[in-house]
Amino acid sequence: MQPPSNSAGTATGAENATDDLSQANLAAGQRVFRFDTFGDEQFWTDTAKMNQVVEQNVDPTTALKVGLKVDADGLPPGILQKVDLKSPATTVALLKMNAVVGVQAVVDANNHITRLGITCALCHSTVDNSVMPGIGHRKDGWPNRDLNVGAIIALSPAITAAQKAVYNSWGPGKYDPRFNIDGKSNPLV
């Protein structure tokens, strides 16, 4: 997904900030919030190799345990009763449907994840759990307090055992955006 066409070419298009709250602008903002990765696939795919981790090792049950959410409105009716929630292939299928809140993936014809990125919605959306815990209707703008960013990053093969220990110590709802820069773990809510 590309930023709205009235963007000034910056990541945020801030130069063209507007008070126009038309339905078209609101819909464009919602699309950016939900689906735009701002190019972070470079980190999540090229550096952290999370596309491989998700494709090979992350089944929906594991994804839900680390706090990822599934948008029930992105699922065909009755699909959850027909799929294996213990299979990473099901996670790939959910990504193809854009049903994993805050995670965008490019999946090729052979069901391999070639690019993986995250959006604002990963941390700043949740679901109402109307289908089951972690699966329901989106609630954009609500914090995902179940999200365990440290446990997710710790799955990466690109980090050391010492880093994994730090990431795994954070727990749900906490994150330290400076850890990779200063090496000091100070996760915040």
Predicted regions and their residues:
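Extracytoplasmic redox metalloprotein regions
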Residues: 13-189
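Bacterial Sec-dependent N-terminal signal peptides
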Residues: 1-17
